[in-house]
Amino acid sequence: MQLMEKVVDFKKLSVEKKQVLFEELENFDRQIFPNAIPVELHQLVYNPDVVALPIIRFYHRGKIVGQNIIAILKLKTAHQPLYILSSRAAFLPDYRNQNRTLLSAIRVTLGYRLKYPTRQLWFVSSLMQPKVYRLFASRSKRFYPRAEVPMPEDYLQVLDLMQNRHVNVQQRSEVVFVHPCVLPQTTPEQLIRLRNRASRHINFYMQHTPDYFIGMGLMCICKLDVLTLLEAAMNVFLGREVA
């Protein structure tokens, strides 16, 4: 299935173009997340602490079928600023298994990494589906938390900092944090299929987030250095998985 993509940095648009694009993003997002709080997307896109906001939009036969809003947030700490990348991806049901979407996000992130090589760049996101967790964890050994592998201390410090920005967080182990998220519109049959294929990664996710189907998300983290990004991109491209 051939997908065309367009990438735009929301932060670089004029006020008028931002308004037009935001309305388009909001309309599509509402199709996938009908239960989301209306101001949620607005707060993400117009957050003054977001320093870059690349948006990838996917098309099939001229029709938009998915979008990935990548927000890079600057956080001030006692030592040096941290740059936290998060992603809000929304796809029509027939297009949710396209690995190319991850490859596109890696490519955009790598461009930012090369442009600002001295910045501490982290990916922190709450994953709400076992298959999505498996997609990330199987592409890089530096993606945490993961089965039977201790999380490095610097990862845990950043994760602890970020979990304090959420509400109703549950700590289920030293390195496992979960909290309520907004699920995409999904049928019960689709939820079952999300965990049909047993694997080391899916088993780990199900062990710690068995209540994902009611909206609990597992907080995950990965340090986005050039080596990690290149390794993940190569693994996605070759269809290769890591334990």
Describe every region a protein language model picked out.
Residues 1-22, 26, 30-32, 41-53, ...:
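Terminal substrate-recognition subdomain of acyl/acetyltransferases
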Residues 69, 84-88, 106-110:
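Contiguous, well-ordered alpha-helical segments that form the cores/surfaces of helical PPI scaffolds
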Residues 75-81:
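A short, polar/charged loop-to-alpha-helix boundary motif
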